[in-house]
């Protein structure tokens, strides 16, 4: 089951698991489809080095720590507006690598759903959608080694508009309190038999 992201589904006029290549390609030039707190574009796959792993973990955790969101890989943007289709490889090795990076470089691991949307004119290429729900298990930390000097071992990102912000210690404490309160509330609900 694919996560429901209301604003983005409204943009396409359909559920994310029903998207085809053409619907995504038609976003080019649409200011309604500009990057925001629930939408981000990458023109290519993340690099396979430490910096790429850190960036992928940060982008995914930022969505999970905020309101959820959609990352579209294979679309360039100009000032946040989708500007050009740049198909990416959709092979199993790429999908396994992304899964391994997210599981190994976020704590707790961020749940997400990959959707490969193939270009009918170029089999094996197209868009890779990473659908990230808002996570009840947050806050999620990035555990990948920092590519820039940082005093923090665990870094907690979240979306702030079309950018990534970093949670302060107070924000992290508040997020943990909310997680534990929600878990306690679920535990107190009457069980159906």
What are these regions (language model features)?
Residues 1-193:
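Conserved N-terminal catalytic/coupling substructures associated with nucleotide/phosphate chemistry
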């Amino acid at each position: 089951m694919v996560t429901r992201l209301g604003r983005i589904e409204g943009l396409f006029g359909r559920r994310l698991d029903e998207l085809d290549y053409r619907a995504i390609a038609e976003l080019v030039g649409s200011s309604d489809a500009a990057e925001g707190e629930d939408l981000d574009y990458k023109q290519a796959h993340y690099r396979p080095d430490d910096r790429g792993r850190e960036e992928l973990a940060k982008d995914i955790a930022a969505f999970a720590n905020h309101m959820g969101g959609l990352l579209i890989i294979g679309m360039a943007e100009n000032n946040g507006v989708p500007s050009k289709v740049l198909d990416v490889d959709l092979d199993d090795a790429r999908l396994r690598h992304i899964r391994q990076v997210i599981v190994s470089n976020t704590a707790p691991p961020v749940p997400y759903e990959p959707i490969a949307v193939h270009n009918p004119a170029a089999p094996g290429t197209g868009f890779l959608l990473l659908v990230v729900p808002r996570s009840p298990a947050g806050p999620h930390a990035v555990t990948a080694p920092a590519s820039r000097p940082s005093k923090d071992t665990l870094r907690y990102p979240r979306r702030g508009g079309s950018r990534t912000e970093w949670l302060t210690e107070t924000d992290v404490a508040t997020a943990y309190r909310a997680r534990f309160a929600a878990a306690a509330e679920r535990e107190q609900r009457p069980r159906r038999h």
